[in-house]
C-alpha cells in the first residue's frame, strides 16, 4: 500500500477573518495540492476558489459527456521516411461540447485523471481506435496513449486483451504510448504490466522521449519497441547544434537497440530533410497531416505522401 501526503495551508488573517473561512480556504488549497499530483503542500491564493469551481464544472460536464457520447477520436498519420508512405496513425481524443464546440484534451484530461473518469474514457478511446483500425490496411498500426492514472488503475493487460478480442484487431497492429512519468514510481509493478502487454503481442512506445528523467536507464530495463522524440527537439534542431546532436544521437541509439524511432512535431521541409539525412525511420507532424478522420481511401491506395507545404503551427 502506497501512502501519500498532501497539505493545504491558509493563514489568518490574510486568508480569512473567521475560522470557517480559513478552514474553507485551506480545503481549497488541499484540493489544489491533490490536483497537482499530490505529495506536496500548497498555500491558498485568492482566485483558487474560482479555479476549483471551474474544475468541478468540468468534472460534472465530463460525466455527462461520457453518457452522451460527446467524444470523438481523430487520427494523425505517421509516415515511413524511407518509402514516403503512411504506416499508421496516432489516435487522439476530442470533446465535442454542445455549447463550447471542440475541446482539446489539454483542457480536460487532467480532470479526468484526478476524478477517476480517465478509466472509462480511456477504454472508450481504445475500443473506438481498435474498431476503426480493424478496417484499415493490414500493414497499418494504430497508436493509443495511456495516461499514468489509466495504467495504474485495474488490469490494463486484461482490458487490452478484451478490446482486441472484441474488435478483431491483431495485437501486433496496436501500439500503446506511455510517458516517462509513468516509470518514476512503482517500477516493478509497471514493468510487470508492460511485460504482460508485450506478451499479448502489443507494441509499447515511449512518448515525449527526452522530457523526463533517467531515460537511458528506462530503455535498458523496459520492453519498448519504439521511441518518440519530443517535438521540442525537432522544433529547435535546425537552428541549435546541441538539439541537432541530441536528435542524431537518439536515432543512432534506436538503431543500436533495434528500437524504431519516430520524430514528433515535424512541420517544415527542412526538418524532414535533416531527419532523412540522420536516418530517422518514421515521422509525424503537421507537415504530413493534421489530426482528423481516418482517410480510408488514402490508406487503401497507400501512395507516396505529398507533404503539406504550408503547414502551420497549431495545437495537436
Task: Name each model-derived stretch.
Residues 13-15, 81, 85, 96-99, ...:
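EAL-family c-di-GMP phosphodiesterase catalytic domain
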Residues 1-3, 87, 172:
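PAS-family sensory domains
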Residues 46-53, 57-169, 179-182, 195-196, ...:
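Bacterial c-di-GMP phosphodiesterase EAL domain
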Residues 8-10, 26-29, 33, 91, ...:
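Small-residue (primarily alanine) positions within well-ordered alpha-helices
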Residues 38, 117, 169, 202, ...:
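Short glycine/serine/threonine/alanine-rich loop segments
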Residues 28-31, 35, 64, 134, ...:
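Regular, well-ordered alpha-helical segments
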Residues 1-56, 60:
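Cyclic-dinucleotide signaling modules
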Amino acid at each position: 500500500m502506497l501512502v501519500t501526503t498532501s497539505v493545504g495551508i491558509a493563514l489568518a488573517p490574510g486568508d480569512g477573518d473567521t475560522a470557517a473561512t480559513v478552514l474553507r480556504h485551506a480545503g481549497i488549497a488541499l484540493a489544489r495540492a491533490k490536483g497537482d499530483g499530490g505529495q506536496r503542500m500548497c498555500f491558498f491564493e485568492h482566485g483558487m476558489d474560482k479555479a476549483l469551481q471551474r474544475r468541478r464544472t468540468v468534472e460534472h460536464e465530463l460525466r455527462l459527456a461520457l453518457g452522451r457520447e460527446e467524444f470523438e477520436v481523430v487520427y494523425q498519420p505517421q509516415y515511413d521516411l524511407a518509402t514516403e508512405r503512411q504506416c499508421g496513425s496516432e489516435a487522439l481524443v476530442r470533446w465535442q461540447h454542445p455549447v463550447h464546440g471542440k475541446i482539446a484534451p489539454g483542457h480536460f484530461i487532467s480532470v479526468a485523471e484526478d476524478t477517476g473518469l480517465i478509466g472509462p474514457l480511456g477504454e472508450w478511446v481504445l475500443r473506438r481506435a481498435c474498431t476503426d483500425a480493424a478496417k484499415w490496411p493490414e500493414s497499418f498500426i494504430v497508436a493509443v496513449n495511456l495516461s499514468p492514472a489509466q495504467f495504474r488503475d485495474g488490469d490494463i493487460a486484461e482490458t487490452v486483451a478484451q478490446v482486441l478480442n472484441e474488435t478483431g484487431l491483431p495485437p501486433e497492429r496496436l501500439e500503446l504510448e506511455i510517458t516517462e512519468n509513468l516509470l518514476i514510481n512503482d517500477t516493478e509493478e509497471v514493468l510487470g504490466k508492460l511485460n504482460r502487454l508485450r506478451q499479448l503481442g502489443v507494441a509499447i512506445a515511449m512518448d515525449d522521449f527526452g522530457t523526463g528523467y533517467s531515460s537511458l536507464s528506462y530503455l535498458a530495463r523496459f520492453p519498448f519497441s519504439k521511441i518518440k522524440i519530443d517535438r521540442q527537439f525537432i522544433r529547435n534542431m535546425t537552428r541549435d547544434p546541441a538539439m541537432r546532436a541530441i536528435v542524431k544521437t537518439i536515432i543512432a541509439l534506436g538503431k543500436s537497440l533495434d528500437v524504431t524511432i519516430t520524430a514528433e512535431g515535424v512541420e517544415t521541409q527542412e526538418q524532414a530533410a535533416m531527419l532523412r539525412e540522420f536516418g530517422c525511420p518514421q515521422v509525424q507532424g503537421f507537415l504530413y497531416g493534421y489530426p482528423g478522420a481516418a482517410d480510408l481511401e488514402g490508406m487503401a491506395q497507400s501512395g507516396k505522401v505529398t507533404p503539406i507545404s504550408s503547414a502551420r503551427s497549431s495545437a495537436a
